[in-house]
From Swiss-Prot:
Biological processes annotated in GO: transcription by RNA polymerase III
Function text: DNA-dependent RNA polymerase catalyzes the transcription of DNA into RNA using the four ribonucleoside triphosphates as substrates. Largest and catalytic core component of RNA polymerase III which synthesizes small RNAs, such as 5S rRNA and tRNAs. Forms the polymerase active center together with the second largest subunit. A single-stranded DNA template strand of the promoter is positioned within the central active site cleft of Pol III.
UniProt GO MF annotations: DNA binding; DNA-directed RNA polymerase activity; metal ion binding
Chain positions recorded as Zn(2+) 1 binding sites: 67, 70, 77, 80
Gene: polr3a
EC number per UniProt: 2.7.7.6
Pfam families noted in UniProt: RNA_pol_Rpb1_1, RNA_pol_Rpb1_2, RNA_pol_Rpb1_3, RNA_pol_Rpb1_4, RNA_pol_Rpb1_5
Record region (Bridging helix): 832-844
UniProt binding sites for Mg(2+): 491, 493, 495
The keyword Oxidoreductase appears for this protein: no
Binding site for Zn(2+) 2: 107, 110, 154
Domain of life according to the entry: Eukaryota
Protein name, as recorded: DNA-directed RNA polymerase III subunit rpc1
Catalytic reactions of this protein: RNA(n) + a ribonucleoside 5'-triphosphate = RNA(n+1) + diphosphate
Length: 1450
């Protein structure tokens, strides 16, 4: 019989979630039983009590028991709800604020909203507008609330309405009787007689309040009209206000509050919710039994207890609970189960524990490929992959089934087509294998080549989880190639890592393409390579490629086999030295490594300076200029800058960009194998002899320290005598410390240079430092020479004892040794005081790291939450999850930061041209002239194939060829080079074959050549004749003079001939190198177009998440310190994590607000001082020599004298008149202008008023204390102004203003307002608008990253700035800012203030459409990013489609 109807078990996608409030009927309808019994268990039957909070109708938590409602066991029954009917209504603690707001908005007598009819209709129309988003509705509701609060009398019934306030934890009072309205006067008149007999009553009448208990509030809410409810942004059908007050309570299923049996069966441990529900039932029963017979006070007390118990059940952290109502032990309410890191949202919905994962310690294995991970056999036997049986794999899977679960490669389970699952531990496996059919699923062991996700926590960026291919190996650790350490930030000192096994073919495909190591060699932060050679590999590469590294044939061939697989064909290059014995250089190893066979198409071309470069390019004495031509290493030693990470000019980055990531990964694998074997065979170690300084080195070190000590002694002497020249804006102390710090810190750097120059070439620490594998010059200097000055918080060691650092030194000692200078090295060992200072310096680093981890972790979480759902769409816009446009085109050019070859640009034109000219010589083609080059370039750029490119990119190509005001173009370089060699050159606009010689006159080449030849012949004849004449007429003096004269002429002629010969010889060489043909230009432009196309951002890219990680991840490498402003020791500026935190928080108050002000007259220091005086806050206390009281018989007054010298030295534009105006305008002093008299320019007199209440002398004391703080000049919010040099070479100045009020600074005479900037984002927004604030965010973050030596693509910063400003105001990435940016309830609930957002959503009937990242993860829906952005339509056969019936057809 055919099954007509089959139950559809296919999972449905949840379209949206509607939040609302449950009515009494809804609660009863949802429930299966009313709970009335407070007893938990029937002690006789040892079963849950019927109608109790553990009734089996609610489900079961016992493995043996069955649910009496659905008849299922604990595994299948999800549980059922019950309800408790409360005898008296209580406030829902989650809605208490909403209840108070509604009570404030309505009349407390007739329940009408406190608005007139006109406004009511206006706001109703607004609220019914479907286009308004939640943020606008919230803003409108706030406006309505404020308007209602101002209304004191109801416009309908005339009742008085006052303020609604909260009293205690959950009592609401109505201050009805405060105010002076007519109705209140009538109310007070009622008590006139009572006051006569009891006068004390008068003070209490105005304190009278209405107690709005839940019963009163419930009755008021029931009377609110439908229209008024809509105005309050609530739903009149599913969200009426009376539902905010609890009359019925839902009892959750037993499965979420299970009973845990105690050992020995002596009882159970009950959940907090169960006990609280039992307590509510008990109080409820007590109220029911006492409601008719008990006193009102007893009932009210029980009611309060019921309210408290219900509140604690919902939220156990209720503030303001009376002591007697507080639970004796901590209780976890419903809110506590949802919020926090371990709550339901973050702990179980947004992130959860997974199956098919493993974790163990990691260790290195250089013989593995870059994209492989060695999986221990123990893990491979446990983790399985469900492979479906097909015609192609049935034989292999049959073998796995026969091997079973204990033998690798085997299988653990078979899942048949009918859903039956069979374990292969027992039974006849041969039979099972024979019965295997197409379509069955075999859960087999991990085998070589399986795709696995590899992850190390903390996962700070995208590259912290990548996919590798499994390689099953013995032993118990996960192993991988050390080149992949950097993206994971892994080391092998005991780190553990996780592996995950994707369970579907689709997941494997996505993991391979999107997360594969080969496809993620570069970081999306800035396009630099992260997967690269490291440590030992760098040391070995440096040793192999050094000068004078020669290998005989057998050794060279052996080294080639080290990096090659057995089946790889290798062609040895010709030896560098043929006689007396064939020798190959170490540089040739790299040639074979890049291009093992001559058939390989990998022709790598680039040149760069390595770490050891000193001078003379190719002839660098330290072999520091690396030149690769067609994959041959011509010169240079290989070090970190060539094969390490973080450098766009590195070998692997160029291989990846010019060829493919696979070729780069293969070369990296070969290098790892070679270096590991090379160091294993040759050996490389470090020991005590390596760091033992030679006598000469020790002597030079002592000389350096003595010289520095002498300088310090001079500074100390000048400081003590007061003759030290002050730095700009610094005190004597600050200047002295800055100079000492600079001098002593320089010692360590000098010692580092000394070590590099004096240590032998074979010194191991030196080799590691030079090649960049480990350590630096400073580390070497500390080991061998001197540990150096210890710094704590940016300064020398502060005084810990009374006026000294430790008791070992004299009081007020400031010499180097007493303030933390360590002259010994680690080799010689430190004395106790030096060791103590050294620990202080080290401790600061440890504390800084510990604090920084928590700070950056929270910062990155906030960034991720704000940016996670931003992605590029098919129109290249960047939108959020609800379709709001954040950027019209990503990064203003639509390019991917990961595809940037040059600094923020997609093509490195110079290197691309070099590569083209090296690989395509085109010797038979004629060279192109400048006007031809320009014409060809323009025609290709304007053609159809460049249509997809932006104008910006096209202009970059034009600038590369033609140049602009700032840079010389390629054509100009070509011409200037020919001129440099004194060759024929072409003018940029010439169209004819003209040659320009020294005298700039045109000349035909053939004529020049003929003339030269003739002249040479004639000269030869002349020379012969002269020699003959000398022999014949030696005695003749006149003849001798003539001969001498002709000899001089002959030398001049030969020099000219030599110069001309060199010129034509050079021309041939230069023409071959510095020429360009049509084919080369066409190929160059094709390469540029190809690279540009690859660099375009793909639609669906999660640019928001990548941007958040790119900004957050470098934060871990920053510090928490405050640094000095460049060039000004005293001007501190906050950098690092605290500054980024200020920026993304959009903080209104920042730690170091600095306005950089340009001057109209920026070359005159006197003018700068005058303008600084106008800005800097100057008080009367600063400029007055004295403020003293004068008492005479005629009266008393205050005498003020101004310090003329001080005013003149600071160029202050003040006198007694301006000061008197400032004093008179100061609030709080209560002085009138006529009370202040002036005597000349520098004296004032203040007379107290005659009718002063407290007496003249007291008033004078008051003035004397407050007058020094009166601001007489400058901007009140500016603390100080420092004059700094813009450029050290040119005497140009600018002002650094510490403080706020950008507008006032810009308006100050002498300031160039258009060139004045502030680092305060909110002030920029208020003064200059949102666009300036956006640019400030970008420039500030870029400055912070640059100051820490980090590079971050500007597109990431741009996206953050656009997100913070796209709503029309600057919103911080905080819980308040994100709430204004985002609409989704689930997303906001999964971030912070979980229950607040849920309660608010319920009150205002919010709807969550589940389109953002967080919501989709919570609900198990495909995220609409990347491969989830689009849907596929299957192409169907039109002939098989059913015919559609016509509209009016029956």
């Amino acid at each position: 019989m055919i099954e007509l109807l089959k139950e559809d078990d296919a999972p449905k996608k949840i379209g949206h979630i509607q939040f609302g409030l449950l009515s009494e009927d809804d609660i009863v309808r949802l429930s299966h039983v009313q709970i009335v019994n407070r007893e938990l268990f029937d002690l006789v039957k040892r079963k849950p009590t019927p109608y109790g909070v553990l009734d089996n109708k609610l489900g079961t938590s016992d493995k043996q028991a069955m649910c009496t409602t659905c008849g299922l066991s604990i595994v299948d029954c999800v549980g059922h709800f019950g309800y408790i009917k409360l005898q008296l209504p209580v406030f829902h603690i989650g809605y208490l604020k909403n209840i108070m707001n509604i009570l404030q908005m309505i009349c407390k007598s007739c329940s009408t909203i406190l608005l007139n009819e006109e406004k009511k209709q206006y706001y109703l129309r607004k609220m019914r507008n479907k286009k308004m988003d939640n943020l606008q509705r919230k803003s409108l509701l706030k406006k309505i609330f404020l308007e209602c609060r101002k209304t004191k009398e109801c416009l309908k019934c005339g009742s008085t309405n006052g303020m609604i306030k909260k009293s205690g934890a959950f009592k609401i009072i109505h201050e009805k009787y405060k105010g002076k309205t007519e109705s209140l006067q009538d109310y007070y008149a009622l008590y006139d007689d009572a006051i006569k007999y009891n006068p004390e009553m008068k003070s209490h009448i105005k304190k009278a309040q209405d107690d709005l208990n839940p019963l009163v509030a419930l009755n008021l809410f029931k009377k609110i009209s439908y229209q008024d409810i809509e105005i309050m942004n609530m739903d009149p059908v599913i969200g009426r206000p009376e539902r905010l007050i609890l009359t019925y309570m839902l009892v959750p299923p037993v499965s979420i509050r299970p009973s845990v049996p105690m050992d020995g069966g002596s009882g159970t441990n009950e959940d907090d919710l169960t006990m609280k529900l039992s307590e509510i039932l008990h109080i409820n029963e007590h109220i029911r039994s006492n409601v008719d017979r008990a006193e009102m006070s007893a009932i009210m007390e029980d009611w309060d207890y019921l309210q408290a118990s219900c509140a604690i059940y919902i939220n156990s952290d209720v503030p303001g609970l009376p002591l007697q109502m507080k639970p004796t032990k901590a209780v976890r309410g419903l809110s506590q189960r949802l919020k926090g890191k371990t709550g339901r949202f973050r702990g179980n919905l947004s992130g959860k524990r997974v199956d098919f994962s493993g974790r163990t310690v990691i260790s290195p294995d250089p013989n593995l490929n870059i994209d492989e991970v060695a999986v221990p056999q123990l893990i491979a036997l446990t983790m399985t992959y469900p492979e479906r049986v097909t015609d192609y794999n049935i034989e292999r899977l049959q073998k796995y089934v026969i091997n079973g679960p204990d033998r690798h490669p085997g299988a653990n389970y078979i899942i048949y087509a009918d859903g039956v699952k069979k374990w292969l531990k027992f039974g006849n496996r041969e039979k099972f294998a024979a019965e295997l059919k197409i379509g069955d699923i075999v859960e087999r062991h991990i085998i070589d080549g399986d795709i696995m996700l590899f992850n190390r926590q903390p996962s700070l960026h995208k590259l912290s989880i990548m996919s590798h291919k499994a390689r099953v190996m013995p032993w118990r650790t996960l192993r991988f190639n050390e080149c992949v350490c950097t993206p994971y930030n892994a080391d092998f000192d005991g780190d553990e890592m996780n592996i995950h096994l994707p369970q579907t073919e689709e997941a494997r495909a996505e993991a391979t393409i999107l997360m594969g190591v080969t496809n993620n060699l570069i970081t999306p932060r800035n396009g630099e390579p992260l997967v690269a050679a490291t440590q030992d590999f760098l040391t070995a590469s440096y040793l192999i490629s050094r000068r004078d590294a020669f290998y005989e044939r057998y050794r060279f061939a052996l080294m080639c086999t080290h990096f090659a697989d057995a089946n790889e064909h290798i062609d040895l290059p010709p030896p560098a030295i043929l006689k007396p014995v064939e020798l190959w250089t170490g540089k040739q190893i790299f040639e074979v490594l890049l291009r093992p066979s001559v058939k390989s198409h990998v022709l790598c071309n680039f040149e760069t300076r390595s770490r050891t470069y000193s001078k003379n390019l190719y002839m660098c004495p330290k072999d520091g200029y690396v030149y690769f031509r067609n994959s041959e290493l011509m010169c240079g030693s290989i070090d970190k800058s060539i094969i390490g990470g973080g450098n766009k000019n590195s070998l692997f980055h160029i291989l990846m960009r010019d060829f493919s990531p696979t070729i780069a990964a293969n070369c990296m694998t070969r290098l790892a194998k070679l270096c590991a074997r090379f160091l294993g065979d040759q050996g490389f170690s470090i020991g005590i002899p390596d760091i033992k300084p030679a006598e000469d080195l020790d002597r030079k070190k002592r000389e350096i320290i003595e010289t520095a000590y002498k300088k310090c002694a001079v500074f100390l002497k000048d400081y003590e005598s007061g003759s030290l020249q002050l730095s700009s804006g610094c005190s004597m102390e600050q200047t002295f410390e800055a100079k000492m710090n600079q001098t002593l810190s320089q010692i360590r750097d000098d010692c580092g240079k000394l070590c590099v120059n004096d240590l032998p070439n074979y010194n191991s620490p030196l080799i590691m430092g030079l090649c960049g594998s480990k350590g630096s010059n400073i580390n070497i200097a500390q080991m061998i020479c001197c540990v150096g000055q210890q710094i704590v918080n940016g300064t020398r060691i502060p005084n810990g004892f009374t006026n000294r650092t430790t008791p070992h030194f004299k009081h007020f000692a400031k010499n180097p040794k007493s303030k933390g200078f360590v002259s010994n090295s680690f080799y010689t060992g430190m004395i106790p005081t030096e060791f103590f200072f050294h620990t202080m310096g080290g401790r600061e680093g440890l504390v800084d790291t510990a604090v920084k981890t928590a700070e950056t972790g929270y910062m990155q979480r906030r960034l991720m939450k704000a940016l996670e759902d931003l992605s590029t769409h098919y129109d290249y816009t960047v939108r959020d999850s609800i379709g709001g446009i954040v950027q019209f085109i990503y990064g203003d050019d639509g390019l991917d930061p990961a595809g940037m070859e040059a600094k923020d640009r997609p093509v490195d034109f110079l290197r691309a041209m070099m590569s083209v000219k090296s690989t395509r010589q085109c010797r038979n083609e004629p060279e192109m002239k400048p006007f031809e080059i320009r014409k060809l370039v323009e025609s290709i750029i304007d053609s159809s194939k460049f249509e997809a490119c932006t104008d910006l990119f096209k202009n970059e190509i034009r600038v590369f060829f033609n140049g602009n005001e700032k840079t010389k173009g390629y054509i100009q370089e070509l011409i200037s080079l020919r001129k440099q060699f004194k060759l024929s050159s072409f003018d940029l606009n010439d169209n004819e074959d003209e040659i320009i010689i020294e005298d700039n006159s045109p000349m035909d080449i053939s004529t020049t050549t003929t003339t030269t030849t003739t002249t040479t012949t004639n000269n030869a004849v002349k020379i012969t004749n002269i020699t003959t004449d000398i022999e014949m007429n030696e005695s003749n003096k006149e003849e001798n003079d003539k001969i001498e004269k002709e000899r001089i002429e002959k030398e001049k002629e030969s020099k000219r001939l030599k110069l001309l010969g060199e010129r034509f010889a050079n021309e041939h060489v230069v023409n071959q190198i510095h020429r360009i043909t049509k084919t080369q230009i066409e190929l160059f432009l094709d390469i540029c177009l190809d690279k540009y196309s690859r660099a375009r951002i793909e639609p669906g890219t999660a640019v928001g998440a990548i941007g958040a990680q790119s900004i957050g991840e470098p934060g871990t490498q920053m510090t928490l310190k405050t640094f000095h402003f460049a060039g000004v020791a005293s001007m501190n500026v906050t950098l690092g994590v605290p500054r980024i935190k200020e920026i993304i928080n959009a903080a209104k108050n920042i730690s170091t607000p600095i306005i950089t002000a340009s001057l109209n007259c920026d070359y005159d220091i006197r003018s700068a001082r005058i303008v600084a005086g106008r800005i800097e806050k100057t008080t009367l206390g600063h400029v007055a020599t004295h403020i003293k009281e004068v008492v005479k018989r005629a009266g008393c007054y205050l005498s003020i004298k101004i310090d003329k010298n001080f005013v003149d030295s600071l160029q202050l534009e003040i006198n007694s008149k301006t000061i008197s105006q400032s004093i008179a305008s100061t609030k709080g002093l209560k002085l009138k202008p006529e009370q202040i008299t002036t005597n000349g320019d520098y004296k004032l007199r203040i007379v107290p008023p005659a009718n002063i209440r407290e007496g003249s002398l007291y008033y004078l004391q008051f003035l004397k204390n407050n007058l020094p703080a009166v601001i007489v000049k400058g901007i009140p919010t500016v603390n100080r102004v420092v004059i700094s040099k813009v450029d050290e070479k040119q005497e140009r100045y600018q002002l650094l203003v510490e403080g706020y009020d950008l507008r006032a600074v810009m308006a100050t005479p002498g300031i160039k307002g258009t060139h004045t900037t502030s680092n305060h984002i909110m002030e920029c927004e208020n003064t200059l608008g949102i666009e300036t604030a956006r640019n400030t965010i970008m420039s500030e973050i870029d400055m912070i990253m640059t100051s820490h030596g980090m590079s971050i693509d500007i597109r990431h910063v741009m996206l953050l700035a656009d997100l913070m400003s796209f709503k029309g105001e600057i919103l911080g990435i905080t819980r308040f800012g994100i709430a204004k940016m985002k609409e989704s309830v689930l997303m906001l609930a999964s971030f912070e203030k979980t229950t607040d957002h849920l309660f608010d959503a319920a009150v205002h009937h919010r709807q969550d459409d589940i389109v953002g990242v967080s919501e989709c993860i919570i609900m198990g829906v495909v995220i609409p990013l990347g491969t989830g952005l689009f849907k596929l339509l299957r192409k169907s056969n039109k002939n098989n489609l059913p015919k559609k019936s016509l509209l009016l057809q029956d």
